UniProtKB/Swiss-Prot annotation:
Keywords: Nucleus. Residues 1-21 are annotated as: Disordered. Pfam families: HEAT_MROH2B_C. Its main location: nucleus. HEAT repeats lie at residues 128-163. Gene3D superfamilies: Leucine-rich Repeat Variant. It is found in: Nucleus, Nucleolus. This is Protein maestro. The lineage of its organism: Eukaryota, Metazoa, Chordata, Craniata, Vertebrata. It comes from the Eukaryota.
Length: 263
């Protein structure tokens, strides 16, 4: 992740002393309008709501950008049929939020909403968005923020299930480049992140078996072609993960993560 300073999730966004109070009011007014439009779509076409969201998603205000991502998540839950109809517009907005250069809150909300929407779309008609989402999600697996890491592992595991035949080769390469992160965060000091990583590890195991490089050990260690066969075996899973704990202890100690996820 870039070195741009970020606020901790859950902390209120600070605002300059010169910032007018009117801005806060305008944010609330905007999303009251969006919420109202969701309930009264017959009075105002939903496409107008998307026009407002698209414009606001590029607003200089972090609060507005963050609330756009949250609003898209609400729309995905309340109007799933409309989400399918406008999926390209929605995905474009969410990918834009996923690459937000300033705010971890915007990125986090984008990932959470993408998880909802991809589940409803079942991976259909993702097109090149699949590449954009995968590349950015992979970079967030090692982020210092617990919530970002957690959501990134959840989303990456979902992408593993949705890759299909079209993106099989591409995703196999991405998983291979993610091996160190997967191994390290099996030992993540945040138990929720470690659990999400373990689930994603299993989802990625078919792609690991297709790779010629099966190793999850240090570079100087011997390659182990039995790794994935052991991983996907029901009997061997727990033994496998227990053995990994001792192997990657040194790596984990280099980047201990102790913060808890916000409720």
């Amino acid at each position: 992740m870039d070195q741009t300073p970020r606020r901790m999730l859950g902390q209120p966004l600070s605002s300059p002393a010169t910032q007018p109070k009117k801005r806060s009011t305008s944010v609330m007014s905007f999303f009251s309008k969006v919420s109202w439009n969701l309930r009264l779509q017959k009075q105002e076409p939903l496409k107008n709501v998307f026009f407002i969201l698209a414009e606001t998603a590029r607003d200089p205000s972090v609060k507005k950008r963050h609330m756009v991502m949250r609003g898209l998540g609400t729309m995905a839950c309340e109007t799933p049929d409309k989400v399918r109809k406008y999926k390209k517009i929605i995905l474009d907005l969410l990918v834009h939020g996923l690459y937000d250069p300033v705010s971890s809150e915007v990125i986090h909300e984008s990932m959470k909403t993408l998880t909802i929407i991809l589940g409803k779309m079942q991976g259909k008609a993702l097109g090149s968005f699949f590449i954009d989402i995968t590349l950015q999600t992979r970079t967030l697996l090692d982020d210092e923020n617990d919530s970002l890491r957690y959501s990134a592992f959840v989303l990456f595991g979902q992408l593993a299930d949705l890759a299909g035949r079209k993106w099989k080769s591409f995703f196999t390469r991405q998983v291979k480049q993610t091996q160190d992160s997967l191994l390290t965060h099996l030992q993540d000091r945040n138990p929720q992140v470690a659990k999400a990583c373990k689930t994603t590890f299993r989802a990625c195991s078919p792609y690991l078996r297709q790779s010629k490089d099966y190793s999850f050990q240090n570079e100087e260690d011997q390659r182990n072609p039995k790794l994935c066969r052991q991983l996907v075996s029901e009997r061997g899973q727990e033994t496998f993960f227990q053995s990994l704990r001792s192997r990657c202890r040194c790596k984990a100690e280099g980047g201990r993560h102790t913060r808890e996820l916000p409720p």
